[in-house]
């Protein structure tokens, strides 16, 4: 039997279909249709406030100088942010903290002892296209919370420096105990790499960015593209943030005067006992290329144009020396508060670090600017 769909049914179906995209377009997860309209109106008002010119000026001011935590340049950025917040009508203030931090007393030493002697650079080469890269206040490459140490030992390449990598080395008959390991950045936090190296008996750890992960194998390098150039290294903390973050001497508490401090021996549960040193990949290549020993286990090959070997023999020996100046140093948080109209017993905390290992245009001044 032939069924005939009535014109009225067709009209109703058409109307439902026509209005469905509009209804979907007006909804936002977590909001009713009416509330979604209000939310969009507020978002449009918010988006109308930022101006590219003011953002550019804020970024210029915040990145004018290298400003490592606890330095006068860091304090200057704190004052600038506080004053800007006050100009917006907020009651912003500076909060001081006394935090145990390290700076290098002298340039770290990474020296190839065998098969030839060569002292490697621990400073990044300046770029002609970027005058800021030659700023005299840029520190040598170093890792926050790395230990002081002076060791000479055979070198082992341990890939990303994670537990499966050490398992692969053990299967290849390579023991890292009493040796210096060189590992590449990636696949985990650098503090994990330092701890795993120490736990396996290594006496030192060198960390570099392999061009396979962050360099020419990924695309054009800076200044032509966004990837890491050959003479660039990655600074950063090697604190065991997975144990606890913040000041190592005041776990779980604010590092303010009057807060009890734990002993340095206790703090070693949160920071390495061995020297840890970052290196640019043009220098790291000089350490990896002469390695002998077993050929690379699966997944160990990077982007250098030669087969990676893991070493572990006396064919390649390295001298690693770090001399750190640890002290309690003053840091400054900028704190402002906006009281809401509803749910006054609940807090929304928005935070971001302001200090930087160098200029901080990417990490993290762009967030302050926005």
Residue ranges and their predicted role:
Residues 28-37, 48, 60-175, 180, ...:
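Noncatalytic luminal/extracellular "stalk/propeptide" segments of secretory-pathway proteins
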Residues 133-168, 244-364:
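Soluble metallo-hydrolase cores and metallopeptidase-like ectodomains found primarily
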Residues 23-27:
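Boundary at the C-terminal end of the N-terminal hydrophobic targeting segment
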Residues 50, 54, 59, 63-73, ...:
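Sec/Tat-exported extracytoplasmic proteins
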Residues 366-369:
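Conserved small/polar residues in nucleotide/adenosyl-binding loops
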Residues 9-21:
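Bacterial N-terminal signal peptides
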Residues 41, 54-57, 61, 76-87, ...:
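Extracytoplasmic/secreted proteins, especially bacterial periplasmic and envelope-associated proteins
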Residues 37-43, 55-67, 266-269:
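Acidic/histidine-rich, surface-exposed loop or edge segments in extracytoplasmic proteins
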